[in-house]
């Protein structure tokens, strides 16, 4: 569910529920971690407030938890949290990091996180159909997740 909100005068507009998903731009966000960013989900829009003419935003509130979250990290320094939680009405749903995708030199590679936390590295060019064990999530820091073999983190998948 989303509704229009003015951060200048606290005006709230009508609700919308026709959106199946959202693309959030982390590039303009000042949050230091994925969790802090998700705590204040909002998307800017072109409409202006009827009361003060300030630019409105869509405030995002989930009524039902999504099954999967895919977050893009374009040129940001935000920490990719190992676990994140989203408030759904009066309860929280916890999502675990499942995959991190990296890009560099016109090529992608990824780290897949298994249920037990084992990290598996995959690069179709160098590993083919095989994945290589690459540590454990419990001993891997946020800093270590930012890069992989000279490539930078561009997507994180949570479920």
Q: Where are the regions that the model predicts?
A:
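UBL (ubiquitin/ubiquitin-like) substrate-recognition surfaces
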Residues: 1-159
């Amino acid at each position: 569910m989303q509704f229009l909100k003015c951060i200048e005068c606290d005006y709230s507009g009508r609700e919308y529920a026709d959106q199946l998903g959202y693309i959030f731009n982390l590039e303009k966000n000042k949050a230091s971690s994925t969790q802090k960013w998700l705590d204040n989900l909002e998307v800017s829009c072109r409409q202006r407030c009827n009361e003060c003419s300030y630019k409105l935003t869509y405030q995002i509130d989930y009524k039902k938890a999504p099954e999967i979250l895919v977050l893009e990290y374009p040129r940001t320094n935000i920490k990719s949290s190992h676990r994140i939680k989203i408030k759904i009405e009066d309860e929280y749903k916890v999502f675990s990091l499942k995959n991190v995708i990296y890009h560099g030199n016109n090529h992608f590679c990824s780290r897949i996180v298994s249920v037990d936390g084992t990290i598996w590295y995959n690069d179709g060019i160098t590993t083919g159909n095989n994945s290589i064990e690459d540590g454990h999530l419990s001993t891997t820091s946020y800093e270590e997740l930012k890069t992989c073999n000279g490539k930078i983190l561009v997507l994180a998948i949570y479920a």
